[in-house]
């Protein structure tokens, strides 16, 4: 009988210990953002990976994020000639500080901002003209550039089981010569 | 670090305008303009794809005021050309012109990419 009581006590303690286990202070997030680009207007998915360090009982986050985006958009033919697709590539790196406004362990509403460095590689159709009778000249612009700027971020996260959360977020980045990009995305994160 | 990043200028690695000219008729010489640019280039490049049954002459001129200076001239022999490339040192910001001349009886078509960088 004593052994049975001891076993039950041990099981209860084990459950209690598990319930009080600390949520990790780091997290990794994978997600996708629907991202708009500067003119000519284009929107497409940007795949994002993020590492975060959580401070002050999860109320403050410092994150480092990398993303990749590649678009190929067709253009209308000019006099029956295909002017070629617009090819646009982005490699993005962002550092963000986020503060949680909700004092709730399962829900987080975070606002923040930070610095962005984006690499862009564009090959874009600029226009076309007829030359002579049936001939066409197509003007294109090819550019590779590194743009720096800042961004603002808002995100909501629901921790649906300990250490796992899903989130939705909105971001705006101002990248000087590359214009303003807005992003609407979802993701899943794991704490460790 | 933040001040350093915010103070950064955009870093342009390459920025070039180029033109793709589709030529299907050779009844008159074809002339296509590329406007001047702000930064100095280092070279002029032509890349040709297509088939013609007679020789065709490709020329590039630098337009400086009322004067046309020849920059590059090449004669394409009859036949099929795949990524035939011509390159010439070129350092001017002036407007440039591509001229394609062939016999009016020439049959075929050419796709010519030309750019300065």
Q: What label would you give each PLM region?
A:
Chain B
Residues 33-59:
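Beta-rich globular "head" domains
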Residues 1-10:
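Sec-dependent bacterial lipoprotein signal peptides
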Residues 39-48, 88-105:
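Noncatalytic modules at the cell exterior or secretory-pathway interfaces
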Residues 16-38:
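Post-signal peptide N-terminal segment of mature Sec-exported envelope proteins
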Residues 66-91:
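An anionic, turn-rich surface loop/hairpin at beta-sheet edges
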Residues 53-58, 104-116:
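Edge beta-strands of jelly-roll/beta-sandwich modules across compartments, strongly enriched
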């Amino acid at each position: 009988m004593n052994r049975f009581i001891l076993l039950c006590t041990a099981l209860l303690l084990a459950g209690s210990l598990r319930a009080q286990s600390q949520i990790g202070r780091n997290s990794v997030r994978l997600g996708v953002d629907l991202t708009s680009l500067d003119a000519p207007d284009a929107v497409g998915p940007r795949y994002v990976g993020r590492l975060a360090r959580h401070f002050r009982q999860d109320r403050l986050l410092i994150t480092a994020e990398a993303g990749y985006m590649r678009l190929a958009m067709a253009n209308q033919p000019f006099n029956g000639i295909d002017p070629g697709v617009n090819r646009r590539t982005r490699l993005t790196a962002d550092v963000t500080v986020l503060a949680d406004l909700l004092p709730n362990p399962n829900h987080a509403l975070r606002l923040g901002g930070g610095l962005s460095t984006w690499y862009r590689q564009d090959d874009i159709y600029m226009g076309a003209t007829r030359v002579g009778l049936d001939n066409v000249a197509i003007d294109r612009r090819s550019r590779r550039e590194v743009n720096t700027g800042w961004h603002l971020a808002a995100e909501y996260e629901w921790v649906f089981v300990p250490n796992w959360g899903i989130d939705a977020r909105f971001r705006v980045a101002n990248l000087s010569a590359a214009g303003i990009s807005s992003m609407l995305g979802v993701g899943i994160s794991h704490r460790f | 670090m933040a001040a350093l990043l915010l103070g950064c200028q955009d870093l342009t690695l390459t920025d070039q305008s180029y033109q793709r000219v589709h030529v299907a008729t050779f009844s008159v010489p074809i002339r296509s303009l590329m406007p001047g640019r702000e930064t100095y280039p280092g070279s002029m490049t032509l890349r040709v794809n297509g088939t013609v049954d007679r020789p065709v002459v490709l020329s590039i001129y630098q337009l400086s005021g009322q004067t046309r200076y020849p920059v590059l001239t090449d004669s394409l022999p009859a036949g099929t050309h795949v990524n035939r490339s011509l390159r010439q040192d070129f350092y001017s910001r002036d407007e440039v012109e591509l001229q394609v001349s062939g016999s009016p009886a020439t049959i075929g078509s050419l796709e010519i990419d030309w750019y300065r960088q």
